């Protein structure tokens, strides 16, 4: 029987990831008009535009309608203003009002947002990870500020695995190549397999996500290759399944498998 194009894998070797590109940032607007604006210090660690926040609100509505908040066990976010604002706006708790006894994910007006504080109440944990940052080099909009500054703006986000307070990864030149970003993407996916969570949201950037997706699907049909190669729009969400076809992860995660033979008895292999 021809099973070409079909894959069958044990569920405990699969994870679901929801890839999200950040909403519109001030650098996107400037760069659309003049690409050289990406090299301007005016857009250092760019924050979201008012339109970008509208996009976040719409994504938030979708996340709730699709009941993703009931499924997502962890939100991984690139440590940049625009990605963090997108992540907490889409996956965070309600507006932090009435003195709710929960550490805020975002304080009021963080990053010139003109938005109220966002609570961590009833939201999944958030983890900042440098591996999923945007293509590094040349563009100041892709250089992060200190972790100390971010912690003051986003108190409930876990920045503990970021090794240095200041940004030591971004260099003025050269800018990372697509091949380098793709390699970083593969490293990121391998790291995902060290996590116990089975369903994870990842809020990142166009260049990184394109590099990541371009690393996979080489053995797929042309339509699927094309689907993987399309750049994500601002605030777009794409859900994917990743499969451990080697032994990258562990079998410690919960599984729906059941061992059988409880209680033990005769076990005829013919039936």
Curated annotation (Swiss-Prot):
UniProt cross-references to Gene3D superfamilies, sorted A to Z: Phosphoglycerate mutase-like
Transmembrane portions of the chain: none
Swiss-Prot/TrEMBL site (Transition state stabilizer) positions: 205
Location of the region described as Disordered in the Swiss-Prot/TrEMBL record: 252-271
Tissue specificity: Expressed in the shoot apical meristem and meristematic zone of the root tips.
InterPro entries: His_Pase_superF_clade-1, His_PPase_superfam, PGM_Phosphatase
Short name of any one Pfam family annotated for the protein: His_Phos_1
Domain of life (superkingdom): Eukaryota
Active site per UniProt: 22 (tele-phosphohistidine intermediate), 134 (proton donor/acceptor)
Induction: By auxin, sucrose, oryzalin and the nematodes Heterodera schachtii and Meloidogyne incognita in roots. Down-regulated by abscisic acid (ABA) and hydroxyurea.
Record-stated family: Belongs to the phosphoglycerate mutase family.
Role: May play a role in carbohydrates metabolism.
Listed name of the protein: Phosphoglycerate mutase-like protein
Organism from which the protein derives: Arabidopsis thaliana
